[in-house]
């Protein structure tokens, strides 16, 4: 594999600061050396879950590798995870990455997901019953609120990485062979055989499906004002809500998506987000941390302007920061201008 195979994903990385999620395994080790070979500047971040026998050796190796190539190496020692390991480990990992991104102004988070990872996810979601958006959840370039996730290896089979990394030192994670994890069951019983015999066709199918997704889920103009994100209602509304919340660092579950549809886009999610709609728009906002008592005149003006009830506390909290007589009118006008 050469830069030609993933060059489309390298160009954004040539500007701004980059952070590579590193584990010491085959995938991230291979990506580390590919990025070095392409003169992409980046630092690395590693999470120690205290689950691997070679954990201290992995940490020392990561630090030495970073030092050799003049890169920063951030390490997070995660607390013990008692249950739901995969889900909790993912949360710990992404929280750590996002903390570093905010503190050090990284523009891109580089992850080493490859074609086998994508197929395993696809098969798992297919078995549960999922739409195209969920089946293709992994994207090579994924914009978040203040940074972008870049996955340069998303169309690269794991066997290709093994060939590339044959002279590199990397560590096998023992948990990858444990069948108590659902992903490993799908890998052993289904994905490995499919990749062994049909990898070229699988690559092409994912490329076709990605293009179909772009056509089926066109991006809708999104605006933001006074801490509220909003867009015009359409048949893609749930897709847009999912995409916006991902940018804000929150991933909706299947049940939450069903709940949003059941409540017709008027509810609270995870006691953290407000989702609301009017006749033409869908709104997303962080729920205010404190319940504020709104004066009667503010409530009356919001009611006369047909501003949905769930949004009024959000707007009032913002109004207190910048009180102006036309505060609500300007917000209403921004909806009309969308």
Swiss-Prot record:
BP terms from Gene Ontology: tRNA modification
A GO MF term: ATP binding
Annotated GO CC locations: cytoplasm
Binding, ATP: 23-28
EC number(s) reported in the record: 6.3.4.19
InterPro entries: Rossmann-like_a/b/a_fold (IPR014729), TilS/TtcA_N (IPR011063), tRNA_Ile_lys_synt (IPR012094), tRNA_Ile_lys_synt_N (IPR012795)
Catalysed reaction, written as an equation: cytidine(34) in tRNA(Ile2) + L-lysine + ATP = lysidine(34) in tRNA(Ile2) + AMP + diphosphate + H(+)
Keyword terms of this UniProt record: ATP-binding, Cytoplasm, Ligase, Nucleotide-binding, tRNA processing
Location within or outside the cell: Cytoplasm
Recorded domain comment: The N-terminal region contains the highly conserved SGGXDS motif, predicted to be a P-loop motif involved in ATP binding.
Family: Belongs to the tRNA(Ile)-lysidine synthase family.
Function, as annotated: Ligates lysine onto the cytidine present at position 34 of the AUA codon-specific tRNA(Ile) that contains the anticodon CAU, in an ATP-dependent manner. Cytidine is converted to lysidine, thus changing the amino acid specificity of the tRNA from methionine to isoleucine.
Name of the protein described by the UniProt record: tRNA(Ile)-lysidine synthase
Native source species: Helicobacter pylori (strain J99 / ATCC 700824)
């Amino acid at each position: 594999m050469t830069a030609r195979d993933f060059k489309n994903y390298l160009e954004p990385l040539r500007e701004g600061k980059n952070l590579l999620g590193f584990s010491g395994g085959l995938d991230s080790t291979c990506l580390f050396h590919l990025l070095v070979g392409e003169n992409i500047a980046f630092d690395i971040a590693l999470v120690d879950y205290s689950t691997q026998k070679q954990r201290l050796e992995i940490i020392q190796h990561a630090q030495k590798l970073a030092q050799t190539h003049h890169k920063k190496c951030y390490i997070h020692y995660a607390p013990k995870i008692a249950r739901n390991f995969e889900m909790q480990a993912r949360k710990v990992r992404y929280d750590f990455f996002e903390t570093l991104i905010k503190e050090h102004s990284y523009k891109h988070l580089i992850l080493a997901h490859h074609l086998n990872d994508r197929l395993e996810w696809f098969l798992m979601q297919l078995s549960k019953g999922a739409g195209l958006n969920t089946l293709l959840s992994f994207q090579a370039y994924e914009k978040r609120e203040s940074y972008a996730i870049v996955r340069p290896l998303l169309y690269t089979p794991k066997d290709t990485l093994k060939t590339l990394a044959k002279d590199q030192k990397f560590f096998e994670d023992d948990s990858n062979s444990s069948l108590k994890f659902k992903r490993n069951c799908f890998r052993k019983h289904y994905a490995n055989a499919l990749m062994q015999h049909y990898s070229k066709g699988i690559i092409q199918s994912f490329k076709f499906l990605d293009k179909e997704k772009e056509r089926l889920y066109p991006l809708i103009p999104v605006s933001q004002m006074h801490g509220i994100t909003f867009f015009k209602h359409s048949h893609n509304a749930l897709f847009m809500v999912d995409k916006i919340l991902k940018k804000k660092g929150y991933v909706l579950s299947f049940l939450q998506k069903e709940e949003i549809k059941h409540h017709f886009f008027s509810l609270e999610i995870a006691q953290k987000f407000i989702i609301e709609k009017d006749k033409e728009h869908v709104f997303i906002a962080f729920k205010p941390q404190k319940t504020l008592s709104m004066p009667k005149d503010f409530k009356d003006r919001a009611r006369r302007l047909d501003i949905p009830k769930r949004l009024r506390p959000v707007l009032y909290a913002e109004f207190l920061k910048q009180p102006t007589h036309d505060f609500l009118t300007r917000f209403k006008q921004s909806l009309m201008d969308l």
